Amino acid sequence: MIFNGSIVTSLDKKIKGQVLDFDYEKDFASVYNWLDQKFVDTKLSNLEETPL
């Protein structure tokens, strides 16, 4: 289960970073993407929890 502060990777590997906000009902997550150093909004279902 993904929470604020969780480290995640997108299924397409374009996002790797830390979750800042999420909503399971809306399938929404706001993530700080370490790969391009930007904040991105994506679908929560597109993310998987990842170890550092």
Model-predicted segments: where are they?
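Basic/aromatic-rich interaction segments and small domains that mediate binding to polyanionic partners
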Residues: M1-L52
